A protein has these predicted regions:
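C-terminal helix-and-tail extensions that cap enzymatic domains
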Residues: 29, 264-303
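Rossmann-fold NAD(P)H-dependent dehydrogenase/reductase core
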Residues: 1-219, 298-301
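Pocket-edge positions in alpha/beta enzyme catalytic cores
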Residues: 40, 73, 237, 276-279
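Short, hydrophobic secondary-structure boundary micro-motifs
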Residues: 162, 260-262, 303
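C-terminal helical subdomain
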Residues: 186, 210, 232-272, 281-286
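Short glycine/proline- and charge-enriched loop/turn segments
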Residues: 163-175, 224-233, 269-272
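Alpha-helical elements of Rossmann-like donor-binding domains used by nucleotide-donor carbohydrate transfer enzymes
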Residues: 83, 87, 129, 248-251, ...
């Protein structure tokens, strides 16, 4: 990592979703190498155990102690998010950092068992619900941080309040595939969620940040067919390494310099201007309200 290693996360408990490949795996390794205790959340046990082994090896190579656990959950399903939150609350005395990193692009429109479009469920509602369910634990562990992986794919997007199921979004398509407009909407939701979360938990000792990792060559698009793979192959020569993409996540987890910038959007260790869709009048409270309805939960009061 190019950022200065402050070791501020030594002994801290981190919950990291989407950590079996790409920037999530790179972040798990970097955090473990700084002495953080990392709980990796994944769907597949074998891949999760492989990721955990790499994180433990990184800690050993750095000469530090790190406890790396594996937790299993399909975050596109609300029942699984709820079960995970209960397990985390019961298993860990504290939670210092929640890193909502899991995400995906889907080439075709799919509905989950909850009746929610799958990319919206995984990329937005899962972080929203998991954060809500773990907020008491985060507050009790304060100072604590919530970090959500967003993307500049959000630029040009708007929150589709009249198209939450993505029918119109998937009808648009793009040169990179039909799923990219929808992906951009979910990543915009991450930015709006972070800003609204920061506003609602202000003064609680819990800080919220989100970031753009840059164009990273990862495997999160592996199951989307030949057209999507072709689109990604076009941009791959311009991509950065997962390690570089994870740098800002790790920095947000440990740096004291981000205090006072709660709710912010970052890229390469610097604040980044949010896309216009994130500043539309009333977008934060409105997204919060519809998200509560979609997960059937009241999150942190009405604000």
């Amino acid at each position: 990592m190019e950022a200065e290693q402050t070791r501020a996360v030594t002994g801290k408990q981190v919950l990291l979703t989407g950590a079996t490949n790409g920037i999530g795996l790179a972040a798990a390794e970097a955090l473990a190498a700084r002495g953080a205790n990392v709980a990796i959340v994944a769907r597949d046990r074998q891949r999760a155990e492989q990721a955990a082994a790499r994180a433990r090896a990184a800690a050993t190579a750095a000469g530090v102690e790190s406890v790396v656990d594996v937790l299993l959950a399909d975050l596109s399903l609300q029942s699984e998010v709820r079960r995970l939150a209960l397990e985390v609350a019961d298993r860990y005395e504290k939670l210092d950092v929640l890193a909502n990193n899991a995400g995906a692009i889907f080439a075709t429109r799919q509905l989950t068992a909850d009746g929610v479009e799958r990319s919206w469920a995984l990329n937005h509602l899962a972080p929203f619900l998991l954060t809500a369910l773990l907020m008491d634990k985060l507050r009790a562990s304060a100072p604590a941080r919530v970090i959500t992986t967003s993307s500049d794919a959000s630029r040009g997007a708007h929150i589709p309040f009249d198209d939450l199921d993505g029918e119109r979004s998937y009808g648009q398509g793009s040169r990179l595939g039909r799923g990219f407009p929808r992906y951009g909407e979910t990543k915009l939701a991450n930015i709006v969620f972070t800003a609204e979360l920061a506003r609602r938990v202000q003064g609680s000792g819990v800080s919220a940040y989100c970031f753009h990792p840059g164009l990273v060559a990862t495997g999160f698009n592996r199951n989307n067919g030949p057209l999507m793979k072709l689109g990604m192959s076009v941009v791959r020569p311009f991509s950065r390494s997962p390690r570089k993409g994870a740098e800002t996540l790790v920095w947000l987890a440990e740096s004291p310099s981000v205090l006072g910038q709660e709710g912010g959007y970052f890229f390469d260790l610097k604040p980044r201007q949010v896309p216009p869709g994130a500043t539309e009048a009333g977008v934060g409270p409105r997204l919060w309200e519809v998200s509560e309805k979609q997960v059937s939960a009241s999150a942190f009061g009405s604000g």
